[in-house]
């Protein structure tokens, strides 16, 4: 499955504890990554600077649903279930 154009849910909903260029302490949940562009695409998608946790997250029908809102809901729910 390929990412839905204009979505960016996986770069917004989850917290990321790994450093990201421009976000050395990672990012909190429900906060857009600084590396998202105006089209909700990752500016460092093909860069070696992209965190491994980001590269390891793959689009799936379960996670992405049928809309950005469904993806945000699924990812925020997962974030709450896995928070320390």
Curated annotation (Swiss-Prot):
InterPro entries associated with the record: Puta_zinc/iron-chelating_dom (IPR005358), UPF0153_domain (IPR052572)
Signal peptide boundaries: none
Source species, domain of life: Bacteria
Pfam family, one: CxxCxxCC
Family: Belongs to the UPF0153 family.
Protein name as annotated: UPF0153 protein YeiW
The species this protein was found in: Escherichia coli (strain K12)
Gene giving rise to this polypeptide: yeiW
């Amino acid at each position: 499955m390929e990412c839905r154009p204009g979505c960016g849910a996986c770069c917004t909903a989850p917290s990321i504890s790994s450093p990201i260029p421009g976000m050395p302490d990672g990012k909190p949940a429900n906060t857009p990554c600084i590396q998202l562009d105006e089209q909700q695409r990752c500016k460092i998608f093909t860069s070696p600077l992209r965190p491994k946790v980001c590269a390891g997250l793959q689009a799936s029908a379960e996670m992405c649903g049928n809309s950005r809102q469904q993806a945000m809901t699924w990812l925020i729910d997962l974030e709450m279930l896995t928070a320390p």
